Amino acid sequence: DALNLYRIQKGKGSYTGIVACADIQDYLEGKIKKHENTLAAKEQQQMHLMISRNAVVKPVLLTYPEVPEITSLIITFIEEHEAFYSVRFEKSGELHTFWEIRDGALIQRLEDLFRERVSATYIADGHHRCSTTGLMYQRLSPQSPEGNCGLFPAAESTIPGRKLWPNARR
């Protein structure tokens, strides 16, 4: 088992989070919060893509209220370990960097902190992927209820030039 840490840097700004799996039950039970309604046509489009690819190829971006101990563990790990992968996108000027946590005790500590201190996460990007996955789960009862997502502290999830909580589809 492993967790990946993920940092996106652009200019002088950056945001860092955890790439992990989330249980679709958390979405269905409202522990993964949505802030906008979805469009049936886009859900249908997402469903066709998921079925044809047999996968969701883009992770969902979730935010959570910052927990200082989680932030401290992430920062310490990054400072003490080399990244296993880094790629710069010239067109956007973004540098994407990944670290892998394989220390079982650290993974367990992070999981415990999320369980104890993060009562809900919030969808920043991926409402249609979440709603479509939920619909497919309810209709098809897949064997694996988990999907990839990126978890970022809300304080770090402000993307320049983009509102984090648009209500365009309410």
Model-based region annotation:
Residues 1-170:
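Surface-exposed, charge/polar-rich loops and edge strands
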